[in-house]
């Protein structure tokens, strides 16, 4: 069986101040563009966000489950779940479907009392903590752009600019990615969302 290419691209960058998540907005299936306004970054709590590449049905299911589990945790413990704990919970959920894996890769980024953290998970739940990550069909292009330009001393504004330029680079080359950029910046105060829409030409 050949390698499955998960459509779309999402990336994450960690700095000392927080985390930046970014994705493009194109939704494709079997060569067709189904939407030019798909949301691939979702906030689970006020301080944890997730970015996805893959099938939108699996993405929406996981977002609902994670939000429910995070809310239950907050009600039981009186505080938000930690980023690492949410990533481990997602790992268990994905692994439980290992015989029929969900067709999605996930970036988890957040800020808690331990500071900023960033994780990448594959379809069967392998979880790795990283300083910068990319998932989906444009992952290699994104990492090729980010790697020589990233350093841990970046400020959030610089990381935001790097993330946007990385996604733009992917969109220029990857037909499964396109149409705009969703951006989320997470720090100790919460999160800010931004959207960049590309105008159609021709």
Curated annotation (Swiss-Prot):
SUPFAM superfamilies: N-terminal nucleophile aminohydrolases (Ntn hydrolases) (SSF56235). It is an enzyme of class 3 (hydrolase). It comes from the Archaea. Residues 1-8 form a propeptide. It is found in: Cytoplasm. Pfam families: Proteasome. The formation of the proteasomal ATPase PAN-20S proteasome complex, via the docking of the C-termini of PAN into the intersubunit pockets in the alpha-rings, triggers opening of the gate for substrate entry. Interconversion between the open-gate and close-gate conformations leads to a dynamic regulation of the 20S proteasome proteolysis activity. Gene3D superfamilies: Glutamine Phosphoribosylpyrophosphate, subunit 1, domain 1. InterPro entries: Ntn_hydrolases_N, Pept_T1A_Psome_bsu_arc, Pept_T1A_subB, Proteasome_sua/b, Proteasome_suB-type. Belongs to the peptidase T1B family. NCBIfam families: arc_protsome_B. The 20S proteasome core is composed of 14 alpha and 14 beta subunits that assemble into four stacked heptameric rings, resulting in a barrel-shaped structure. The two inner rings, each composed of seven catalytic beta subunits, are sandwiched by two outer rings, each composed of seven alpha subunits. The catalytic chamber with the active sites is on the inside of the barrel. Has a gated structure, the ends of the cylinder being occluded by the N-termini of the alpha-subunits. Is capped at one or both ends by the proteasome regulatory ATPase, PAN. This is Proteasome subunit beta 1.
